[in-house]
Amino acid sequence: MPTVDLKILDARLADQQPAYATPGSAGLDLRAAIDAETEIRPGETRLIPTGIALHLEDPRYAAMILPRSGLGHKHGIVLGNLVGLIDSDYQGQVFVSVWNRGHETFRLAPLDRIAQMVIVPVVQVDFRVVDDFTSSSRGSGGFGSTGRQ
């Protein structure tokens, strides 16, 4: 299993580091490293610190920040940028852009789990400019061109 350098920037997280909840978990929960409960009103976005910094270092990996399904479904709390992407050479604190798309004010308490992080492989490519593509059965059809059923 690859290793990633992790800095704990908030001492409260020393015993609550990102960890996989089950052997089959893809994501690691990120927590709100805030000092007091904060309210996020409907339609509002907030940048929430996680209290950790990481350095993936290896350009074959990136980290994706994704919403937690329960927060989105039950409370309308999703990511303000929909998906966060952390490049392998980033070394700063991880922040989560939290957006309340719901109709009720959401109260976020210190150390609440607010998002999940998934480490993913990355393939960097070189582009070759061409005049035409080799034909495929799909061609340039998009936005529903393959049907609904």
Swiss-Prot record:
Belongs to the dUTPase family. It catalyses: dUTP + H2O = dUMP + diphosphate + H(+). Substrate binds at residues 68-70, 81, 85-87. Keywords: Hydrolase, Magnesium, Metal-binding, Nucleotide metabolism. Pathway: Pyrimidine metabolism; dUMP biosynthesis; dUMP from dCTP (dUTP route): step 2/2. It holds the Pfam family dUTPase. GO terms for biological process: dUMP biosynthetic process; dUTP catabolic process. This is Deoxyuridine 5'-triphosphate nucleotidohydrolase. Gene3D superfamilies: 2.70.40.10. This enzyme is involved in nucleotide metabolism: it produces dUMP, the immediate precursor of thymidine nucleotides and it decreases the intracellular concentration of dUTP so that uracil cannot be incorporated into DNA. GO terms for molecular function: dUTP diphosphatase activity; magnesium ion binding. Its cofactor is Mg(2+). PANTHER family: DEOXYURIDINE 5'-TRIPHOSPHATE NUCLEOTIDOHYDROLASE (PTHR11241:SF0). HAMAP family: dUTPase_bact. InterPro entries: dUTPase (IPR008181), dUTPase-like (IPR029054), dUTPase-like_sf (IPR036157), dUTPase_trimeric (IPR033704). Its EC number is 3.6.1.23.
